[in-house]
Design a protein with these regions (language model features):
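N-terminal Rossmann-like dinucleotide/flavin-binding domain of flavoprotein oxidoreductases
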Residues: 226-249
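Flavin-dependent oxidoreductase catalytic cores
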Residues: 1-193, 197-213, 221, 229
Length: 249
């Protein structure tokens, strides 16, 4: 059936377009297609000359066991799908793209260098920092606002029926109304009370626009409740919010 779909797609779009197929290399469900079964399927797909690349993920929407992997949260380790992508790449001559908690360009480079994939998909990472490719190209890795996998304003907003955004990047999804930041014509002195994530972001934006900013925090450390959130089991990556904001200030 897959081969028939690929053949019909090729017939409709012609030979000058690229055809890719996204698969779940392990659906993580009792009745789902598991990794060994997909390896056998991929061996057969390897002979399909009309397929240009394979996009490898894991999980499914059949139940809670698989659905958590559709948009994997922060408690799941980075680049955890790459071993399955590497196993598929070993039996195929096609270009392999892999996605799944790959949130930094240097991590993507490690995956590709290890021969586990040829390309990496980084959707939420691009929502968090649309300038990530340019920063990577210019050697500004420390300035990248890395996605933390919190799933609050991206997939969380999607399920609520509202526009996708990012808790670290309020411009995302609001580009036409909030951005890009422009330099102010009238420089002011700005006092920001509270050095939590909201206060840090407000101070950073005000400074970027050219204002003179004073950020006041009662405690000895910036970060607010994100410092507490990172102490919860499986939520340590919340602390990266503070690290990212420090880079912006």
């Amino acid at each position: 059936f897959i081969s028939e779909c690929i053949a019909q797609t090729r017939h409709l779009i012609g030979t000058d377009k690229i055809i890719g197929l996204r698969i779940s290399a392990d659906e993580h469900e009792p009745d789902g297609i598991d990794a060994p079964a997909w390896l056998q399927i991929c061996k057969r797909l390897n002979d399909n000359s009309e397929l240009d690349f394979l996009d490898v993920t894991v999980g499914s929407m059949m139940g809670p066991g698989g659905s958590v992997h559709v948009v994997p949260p922060m408690q799941i380790e980075h680049a955890y799908t790459t071993p399955k992508a590497g196993a598929i790449k070993a039996v195929m001559d096609k270009t392999i793209l892999v996605a799944g908690r790959i949130n930094q360009p240097q991590l993507a480079e490690e995956v590709i260098a290890a021969g586990q994939a040829d390309m990496c998909g980084m959707t939420r990472a691009m929502i968090s920092d649309p300038e990530m490719p340019n920063k990577a190209r210019n050697g500004q890795l420390g300035d990248i606002r890395a996605c933390i996998g919190c799933n609050q304003a991206c997939i969380g907003h999607y399920h609520m029926g509202v526009g996708i955004s990012c808790i670290q990047n309020p411009l995302s999804g609001r580009e036409l109304t909030l951005g890009p930041h422009t330099k102010t014509k009238k420089r002011k002195r700005v006092l920001v009370a509270g050095g939590g994530p909201a206060g840090m972001k407000a101070a950073a934006v005000a400074a970027q626009r050219g204002h003179s900013v004073c950020l006041c925090e009662a405690s000895s450390q910036l970060g607010g409740q994100a410092l507490l959130a990172q102490l919860l089991p499986g939520r340590s990556e919340f602390g990266a919010i503070v690290d990212n904001l420090h880079q912006e200030m």
